[in-house]
Amino acid sequence: MAASHVAVMVLVLVAACLAGKPDIPNVVWHENAAAAIGTDIAEVARNAGVDVPELLRLLTDRDIGYDTANKRLLYACESMAVPAGATPAAAPGSATAGAADPTDLTLAFKLHSRPGAPRRLVLDFTGHTTTGTAWNSASRPSIVTPPYDLDGVPSTFSDAERRNIIAIWRAVAEDFAAFDVDVTTEETDASGAQLNLADNGARAVIGGSSYDWYGAGAGGVAYVNTFGNTYYDPAFVFPAQLGSGYPKYVWEATSHELGHRLGLSHDGDTVGNAYSTGSGIWAPIMGVGYYKAVTQFSKGEYANANNKEDDLAIITDPTRLMTSARGFMAYRPDDLGSTMAAAAPLAGNPTAADPARTTAAAVGVIERSGDADWLSFAAGAGPATVSIALTPASPDGNARANVDLRLEVWASGAAAPLATFNTAGALLSGANAVTLPAAGTYYVAAIGTGDTDFTSYASLGEYSVALEYPTPSSPPSPSPSPSPSPSPAPAREIRLTLSSYSIVTGRGTGKNPATTYGVSAILIAKDENGTPITGTSVTMGATWASSTYSKSSTKTVTYTTSAAGTFQVFASPTTTVTPGSATLTINTVSASPFTWNQAASTPVMTFSWP
């Protein structure tokens, strides 16, 4: 850590200690909390999801509060606050990245990391009024949080603000990528109503200053162990105390406060730091990760840790009570086989430039500690390249990936890998060369691993793998006598179909916002064998109609499919509040050496809204 960064952190910690806690109705702080709990200690411990000895340890944290009316703990994370303007140099991270952030800034409030997941984390940047919750009281019946704002114009969102929102969402989504949860910036359901998060989610409201109502400098505040219980919604994150909305600070604070909602407490150390800053390139999410490239959940495996709670076990504990249902989050299902025998086969495509070379690609997630994802492919003998891409750094250069991989390449039936790739002091990414000794079946294993500063415990997250290798020879066919004329090779096909869609209903900004409509659709390109095709170029247009909105076609837009063969379309007409419909039309589809099979595709898609 640079000396200037150390100075900033020292100033923050000292300022927090001297500031004193604000006077919030029904809340007592730190050293006064134990006395206020009194004989209710067993109930308070149960509400916090801990035993009594652990509760007594938690009460030594000067940022802990006790809500006497609800017998609940809350954290006011004053030591997460950062002086305005104290923007650090970008944390070091890999320059090699996976798919870039969405460049369509209209998507900023329609983002989803895992649509349809049974749990949701809502990142609310557009302003929020909190009423009827544990945060409210007779003297504070409503808490009005302004929108996320950099330029002093809260009624509209600038391009810079939208880019920051997308960057923050992407980082928080990576922090929770191992779980079956949708991290989303879409705050309303299809009818335009606020999402009901009872028994399924939590909201983080990101905007304004802690001095707007809390009354002291804090990076965020949240009730403990209250995921899925809307009476304790939301968690508050205060950009004004986070480098004036600096994305790295905001996403670290957001994941930290949501961690409290999931039952997690602070990761500090035994040498006087309530919030650990980690070591080397790593820091715990429940400490302070502002100046480290890699932040992860923890179980106290770092030096001098004062908190040994198992973050992943707490988050996935099926007995945790929400409102009436139990189980905060589950791990997301394993997406690829975890052994050589269960390896997912890759169907490669010879390159147009050199048919003697074949490419193949896949995307994966390391969901559990020590998880391994296995892929298989048939190749000829010769040089091969295996490339890894992780969640990319933010546009301002701050790393966001959580997973470190050890990559192994195996030959079929071998007792040891042909090659192992595992960088020290940095996350594995980029191209890795290996020589395949003979034609045959080979395997790639991507394994979550640790590094000098952290273990494999929470080395979890998304990645993509791309391979280039010698094209395997086809088995020779017997030649009858006389030999018939050779048959033409079967045509390769692209079949483009609708994978999923939703009608997106939202609200505009300003004093009298109108209802807005849009279509969010995911399409997938596959070959005749059902294998996803990456790099397919698709041009599409959209036609809109409603009772008060004249029929109109949008300009044609070109999309390119990802490594999973998919791309997302988001289209919306001008603001309208009447019933209507949208028709998306595929105009062209191309990817060498394939031919578009229009009859087996879905070239025209019509969607309606009430």
Model-derived features with residue positions:
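Beta-strand-rich structural segments
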Residues: 385-392, 513-530, 569
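Active-site-proximal segment of zinc-dependent metalloprotease catalytic domains
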Residues: 115-119, 133-134, 138-270, 275
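Primarily auto-inhibitory N-terminal propeptides
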Residues: 17-150
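Short flexible loop/turn segments that cap and initiate beta-strands
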Residues: 403, 526-553
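Non-catalytic, beta-strand-enriched accessory regions in extracellular/secretory proteins
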Residues: 352-385, 397, 428-432, 443, ...
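Glycine-centered loop-to-beta-strand initiation motif
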Residues: 428-432, 440, 555-573
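C-terminal edge strands of extracellular/lumenal beta-sandwich accessory domains
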Residues: 303-347, 375, 398-401, 406-415, ...
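Beta-strand-rich domain onsets/edges
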Residues: 380, 488-520, 526
